[in-house]
């Protein structure tokens, strides 16, 4: 799932600077109101990212507006099976001018377990989180493990750790160590084959 490159957007709202200006805000729900800020190269288009943590009975969505690069915009979406019948999903929509059109979330996958599993975890504000077994479904035959942090002026560094099943390994690069405000930094990216569930 090449589009998983956008996982770097799960807890980022990208950088700033250049001639184009875009809305900057984040909120729980479907929309947010913020302020306009200038974009920095290579972020040359305006964008809106929707994130969703969903299970069979509950879903929580957040919206984030900022500047994005055209190449990231082409990636579109990502879906990670984090276990306990839950997914973390993202959709990115970009445009030359505001407002950007929304891209709806489809229903949760109805795929059946495929005989594989991965460590699953959703850790926010921590790089260490309790693991559990995520049962892979459908075409999910890879395990992903992503650790990073986002530096904010307030409340400071926001760490995160994501683990679960994916359909293919993303192409992600580790970030340089720095503390520029409003930037996301990937510290660990691992992707390997899922584990076969032992037959009894």
UniProtKB/Swiss-Prot annotation:
Q: Which residues are glycosylated?
A: 176
Q: What's one Pfam family the UniProt record gives for this protein?
A: PLA2_inh
Q: Which CDD domains match?
A: TFP_LU_ECD_PLIGA
Q: What is its main location?
A: secreted
Q: Where, per UniProt, does this protein localize?
A: Secreted
Which SMART domains does the UniProt entry name for this protein?
LU
> Which GO molecular-function terms appear in the entry?
phospholipase A2 inhibitor activity
List, alphabetically, the InterPro entries matched: CNF-like_PLA2_Inhibitor, LY6_UPA_recep-like, PLipase_A2-inh_b-type, PLipase_A2_inh_N, Snake_toxin-like_sf
| Residue ranges crossing the lipid bilayer per the database entry | none
Q: Could you identify this protein by its name?
A: Phospholipase A2 inhibitor gamma subunit A
Report the source organism: Gloydius brevicaudus siniticus
